[in-house]
């Protein structure tokens, strides 16, 4: 990891800087997320690959949790000096790991309290919801991104299928 990347990550760990970037780019400058509502989250996510059952490590640049009105959501700022043409898939990996981490925590809580869903195959009770995971990609290059911004940009669809699928878009800054 280069010195520039470390400096960027260090700056973004300041909650006031993080909240300013989120507010300007996600909420049009409105002060929706305050520094006081943010808490740091570990950037390392461990996930098990379905294909070979091996553990994998994912490293998010600067993740934080925002607690607002007794509800939480996760925000992650990803630094990109070089344009990455698979960024939507990388982001899906981060989000998948973060959602699976939440499911694991809820299931563990259910096990401890005996609050099992019925039927057990549901895994979570109907009233149990996950917290959203939102990633903003900060483009530090001198040029426009010009790479895929959503999964659909990376896919080659048979005729008439593309418009049927939901776009999973990156929030690119």
Labelled PLM ranges:
Residues 1-172:
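Accessory alpha/beta interaction modules
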